[in-house]
Design a protein with these regions (language model features):
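Bacterial N-terminal signal peptides that target proteins for export
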Residues: 1-8
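Hydrophobic h-region of N-terminal signal peptides that target proteins for export
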Residues: 12-20
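Sec-dependent signal peptide cleavage junction
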Residues: 21-27
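Extended ligand-binding clefts on enzyme/binding-domain cores
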Residues: 27-62, 91-95, 130-135, 149-155, ...
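Alpha-helical solenoid scaffolds that mediate protein-protein interactions
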Residues: 63, 108, 121-124, 128, ...
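Core register positions within helices of long alpha-helical scaffolds
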Residues: 104, 163, 167-170, 186, ...
Length: 426
């Protein structure tokens, strides 16, 4: 009898221990340590919203086709080995779109597209000597090959470096391009820029924040949509240039900066900000939430998903932002605002059109915040994106470049296809 009781006691203890282990596992899934970097799991919000995997895959493939291969594509191949992404409506190619194209290519494992864009960008936009050495001219006319500016926009280099680090991790450095070497060239040159020729580090080293431009007065303020703490975590992991702690500090600073830059009620941010987070007025446009700002919710969702180091604030932000847009009509909210949510007096023009509209780009990035906001009605934004189309608006305006790229990025995020590409055996 004692043996039976002893056996029962052991079994009960085993069951309780197993239950406790199972509960701990469930709890661990909810901790910040279980962000995608740690779990290698990326949520598929479309699947959670009730869509079939086959339909999700088809929607993503169609979007890629439309933007990179279809009759309204913004990607164009040049000769046997190069290609570029063009902001067609503005008749230029810019580091923004080129680096976006490379990010999409490395995420979707399209090596030829990645290599073509990099070769074109390096040949026609990267400075090979002088104070700007290794930085990129931010805009060029792809028909005349005349640069619209010699200067850099810091987000272009931010994306280029991250693209190249991911490419190195995915494909290695012995397939024709030394991706890691190219990333290090940009970073090593960046750290040598001390103001000579009025050219600086991409990051204001005093404030540990990315600059609007690494030149002149533009080094002293910033653009909230350039704040991608997730990318800086990637740099800290894979750049291996001796500045890991600086990149970690910049990531943490960006998170705190976004707390200050986003309105406490609407969640809206200004296109440009001082390092304090206060709006920064410019000579070309008064303060407002406009095209650059559309990227902020997408960037915050990425950081939440990839590293999960600021979840509490990010969850509150997502609720505020979605609640504000919902108050304007989930199928009608416009695309430019004053930070308090009122209509702006000055409208920023796009492609010859100066009007407010319900823009696909903002519909897309707003849906990304459903990665963060777990309230059931948050899926309304996911359904709105699913039903949206990359096509001309009623007045004829059509932007497969900015609308299209943000649309594709958002489909990738919400389907779990926008990931940290870790080092792989080659």
């Amino acid at each position: 009898m004692k043996c039976v009781k002893k056996g029962l006691l052991v079994m009960i203890m085993f069951v309780l221990s197993a239950n406790s282990f199972g509960q701990n596992k469930k709890q661990n899934k909810k901790t910040p340590g279980q962000a995608a970097f740690y779990s290698n799991t990326y949520p598929n919000i479309f699947l959670e919203a009730g869509y079939k995997q086959k339909d999700i895959d088809e929607k993503l493939a169609r979007a890629y086709h439309d933007i990179f291969e279809g009759p309204n594509r913004v990607y164009f191949e040049v000769g046997d080995s190069m290609g570029y992404v063009s902001d067609v409506k503005n008749h230029d190619a810019r580091t923004e779109g080129l680096s976006y194209g490379m990010m999409i290519a490395v995420q979707l494992n399209k090596k030829d597209v990645f290599d073509r864009i990099w070769r074109w960008s390096k040949k026609y936009l990267q400075h090979q000597d002088g104070p700007r050495e290794a930085y990129f001219a931010w805009s060029i006319n792809p028909q005349t090959m005349k640069k619209n500016s010699e200067g850099s926009a810091s987000d272009g280099e931010l994306y280029f470096v991250t693209d190249l680090l991911f490419a190195s991790n995915r494909w290695g450095n012995n397939t024709g391009i030394n991706y890691y070497g190219e990333a290090r060239r940009i970073l090593d040159a960046m750290w040598k820029k001390d103001g000579t020729g009025n050219i600086y580090n991409l990051f204001n080293t005093e404030h540990k924040q990315i600059s609007f431009v690494p030149e002149g007065d533009g080094y002293k303020w910033t653009d909230p949509s350039y704040h991608l703490p997730a990318f800086l975590e990637v740099w800290a992991l894979y750049a291996k240039d001796g500045h890991e702690q600086f990149y970690k500090d910049c990531a943490d600073t960006s998170r705190v900066f976004l707390h200050r830059a986003c309105h406490p009620v609407t969640g809206l941010n200004a296109d440009y900000s001082d390092f304090s987070g206060a709006p920064h007025p410019t000579r070309w446009m008064p303060v407002g939430f406009r095209f650059d700002s559309w990227r902020v919710p997408m960037n915050i969702a990425m950081d939440y998903n990839w590293f999960g180091k600021d979840k509490s604030w990010q969850q509150e932000y997502a609720k505020r932002f979605q609640n504000f847009l919902r108050s304007k009509g989930i199928n009608t909210f416009e695309d430019q605002f004053n930070l308090d949510g009122s209509r702006p007096d000055v409208i920023l023009q796009a492609g010859g059109f100066k009007k407010l509209r319900h823009s696909l780009g903002l519909v897309s990035t707003a849906a990304c915040t459903s990665l963060i906001n777990k309230e059931k009605n948050s899926l309304d934004f996911v359904h709105a994106l699913w039903n949206a189309k990359l096509e001309p608006y009623e007045d004829g305006y059509f932007d497969p470049y900015y609308d299209g790229l943000l649309y594709l990025f958002s489909l990738m995020q919400l389907s779990g296809k926008y990931q940290i590409i870790k080092q792989q055996a080659h």
